[in-house]
Every structure is written in C-alpha cells, then in structure tokens.
C-alpha cells in the first residue's frame, strides 16, 4: 500500500508539472483587442520576436520555450552562420529601446528534414538561443499545437509582426508591432483561390498539404514583407496556440491570394523531439 501511495503521489506531481507547463504558455497578461491593422499593446503578444542579422530585422519569430524560437526556414541562406544572428524579445517597437527587451545571440539553426525553399515545403527553422531567457509579463512562450490538430476553417486568428503595411509602404516612425485578425481557410479551398487567374493546371497543387491559409477572399488584411517567420496564433481553450508560421503569399492582401503559413501541427513531433535533446 505504501508503494502504491508513493506511485500515486509521483503521478500527481508529474501531472501537476505538466499542467503548470501548459498554463505557462499562451497566456499574456494583456488581452487582445486587435481587430485589424492596429498597433499592439505592451505585453499583448509576449512570444513575438524579431530575428536580426547583424543588428537588422529580417524576420519575425515566436518564443516556444525559454531557449527556443520558431521562425521560417527561408529567413536564412542555404549556408547559415548562426553567430551572425540574434533574437530580440520583449520589444514593442523596433526603433524605441526599452528596458524590458532582451537581445540574445543564436547558437544553432535547425531545419526540418523535408525543408525545400524552392517548393516552400517544411518552411520552418528552430533557433536555439545561446542561453535560456528569463520569462516576464513581456516575454512568454506561446503554446504549440497538438500533433495533427486542425482548427476549423473560419476560426479567428491573429498574425503579428513588424512587416510593411503594404508593398513598398514601411511602418511609421518607431516601427510599432502590428497585428491583424484573419480567419483560417481550408488548404484545398485556398489552393483553388490561388488557381484563379494563374497559369497552373487545376490538378497541380500550389498550396501544399503542409501549409494552411488565413485571410479574406477579397484581401484587405494580410501579412506583408518583413512579417515572414512570424506567428499566426489562435485561441484554444483559453490559451494562444501557434497554429502557423508566416511563409509566403502573392503580394499583400490581394483578392484571391490569402496568406500562406507553414502548418505547425504537422511538425510538432519534430519540434518536440529537438526541444528534448
């Protein structure tokens, strides 16, 4: 009986730890009220990061663990030197420094085994930071989706980043973090939209099964240049979940050309395996 009691206590401790780990992600202190194309509030998207090459912003990213950031593979050249990259965390504006910010060097850049920049396949990159970061109200990880999970089409999600407002139109002075609410689209329906006006046979996929889409058929709201690698997050059971990573699109917010994202749930097993090494 004593052995059984110890086992029960151990199980409760393990389950409690896992529940704490779950509760520690995807729950910013500031609730989101961004509906479309407005400045983010301080602490609203605490997992948002800026991937920087020699001090210049190149892509967005998401903190998924104290020492790991998820972004897009195409943000890096075929031969990458991690020492040239760093990750900015806790920032609300790229041009206005804050005492809450952290700039951490990148130790390693890991790509999925099926990554292909030419085919926009497996467009993810895991960045291991040189050291774990201390979490705060402005620096928090986002939750990863369960492997193979599929949020229903129409789910309201948010894409955030420091990208251009439209092609050739940069952010205003200070470069504040932006966010826009976009609905999820079925990947096959999205593929049909991309065939409209395209000289591509209907049987040939443009949007691959490993992708998902978000946006409006009429356009108007979308990610843009500089948002690549950034998060597409959806609220699930009271937690923000990293459903997609900004991958590619035709222009920005054009009709029949919604934003295309890498489906994070498809790569959750690979991500979790890397994090546990």
From Swiss-Prot:
Residues 1-24 form the signal peptide. One of its GO terms (biological process) is proteolysis. It is an enzyme of class 3 (hydrolase). SMART domains: Tryp_SPc. It is found in: Secreted. The gene is Prss33. Coiled coil: none annotated. Disulfide bonds join 59-75, 157-234, 190-213, 224-252. One of its GO terms (molecular function) is serine-type peptidase activity. Its main location: secreted. The keyword Transit peptide does not apply. Residues 34-276 form the Peptidase S1 domain. It comes from the Eukaryota. Not glycosylated. InterPro entries: Peptidase_S1_PA, Peptidase_S1_PA_chymotrypsin, Peptidase_S1A, Trypsin_dom, TRYPSIN_HIS, TRYPSIN_SER. The active site is at 74 (charge relay system), 123 (charge relay system), 228 (charge relay system). Widely expressed. The keyword Calcium does not apply. Keywords: Disulfide bond, Hydrolase, Protease, Secreted, Serine protease, Signal. Serine protease that has amidolytic activity, cleaving its substrates before Arg residues. It comes from Mus musculus. This is Serine protease 33. Belongs to the peptidase S1 family. Its EC number is 3.4.21.-.
